[in-house]
Amino acid sequence: MKKLLSIFLLLGFMLLTANISDAAVNSYDQYGRKTGSYRETSTGYNSYDKNGSKSGSYRKTSTGYNKYDKNGSKTGSFRKTTSGYNEYDKYGRKTGSYKTGSNGVTTKYDQYGRKTGSFKKDSSGRVIEYDKYGRKVGSYK
């Protein structure tokens, strides 16, 4: 049964809050070349590079997600807010935020509140990522 994924483009890239109805999601660059994938686990999500090697993980917490590298070391976290998520580094310093509007567009901001990009689902169900100028930089499906 397909489950609703909340993917964070954490960015390092990943953790966006775009909802994709599948247990596995692939990421692509602006030219359509596969760059990685995300798979749902019992505790959250694992991320993989384009060759299928595990590159990190995201584990659910009571307030959001913790982010770990491939060796299991914590590298940051995401905490749920009323409009999306705030992102923090491993020391607890805020590094950015993701806010989803009523139009379904998720906008990414840096720690100073400046827009750095956005995510929007298209008619085919893909989530398209744009930079702050509105140029397509990647997609998720």
Where in this protein do the model-derived segments appear?
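Positively charged n-region of N-terminal signal peptides that target proteins for export
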Residues: 1-4
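Bacterial N-terminal signal peptides
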Residues: 7-16
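Sec/Tat signal peptide C-region and signal peptidase I cleavage site
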Residues: 16-23
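Repetitive, compositionally biased segments used for assembly/scaffolding
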Residues: 23-141
